[in-house]
Amino acid sequence: KDIVGLVDGYRESAQSWRELLLDLKRRGLETGPELAVGDGALGFWKALREVYGETREQRCWVHKTANVLNQTPKSLQAKAKGHLQDIWMAETKADAEAAFDYFIEAYGVKYHKAVERLIKDRERLLAFYDIPAEHWKHIRTTNPIESTFATVRLRTVKTKGCLSRKTALAMVFKLILSARRKWRKLDGSNQLAELSHGFKTLVTRRLRYGFQCSYGY
């Protein structure tokens, strides 16, 4: 697991993400990763389809859960969250599909907006099930890099004065390098070579102040 790209860009624009992905391609990642994991940022997915059109998409379940629960009353959110967890914590894809259908049936009539937000990404939410189970917990959310971004946000918020573009980029890069020392080893890492052409995953998120970052394994 390692950082593979960091650029400054304009919010979630497709152009900013395109620059990062093209930089990865220029530096040797000519064939795109098998799977890309991220939230619902339209800019990233648009750029990914243009640069690495064969890469499969996996939506982050943490972000999607929050997005769906926002369309339900607070009194129901704990119960609905449990039913959503039944989907992405299922032991098989068949069980996940069954739990998905149950959520639609249970909430579709009264909370159709919540269900609509879920079903529009159905295939992209369940893509991780086509990968060996040892890797699931690393690729169904963006959690593996969220703690790193929290470190970056904490430091940038406390930084006083106006940073130049180069200074800000250098500071963010050093913070990520420092946080990388605490990254835990991937479960099932010894099986990566057995996957088709050395399975690669790209996990992306936008950092504070418009920095785009990706890491892969």
Predicted regions and their residues:
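A generic short alpha-helical patch detector that favors 3-5-residue windows
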Residues: 9-13, 36, 57-60, 72-76, ...
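Acidic/histidine-rich catalytic cores and adjacent linkers
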Residues: 86-217
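Inter-helix linker motif
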Residues: 52-70
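Conserved phosphate-handling catalytic cores of large alpha/beta enzymes
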Residues: 66-91
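RNase H-like nuclease fold core
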Residues: 1-38, 42, 46-47, 51-54, ...
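Short helix/loop capping segments that flank catalytic or ligand/cofactor-binding pockets
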Residues: 45-46, 70, 127
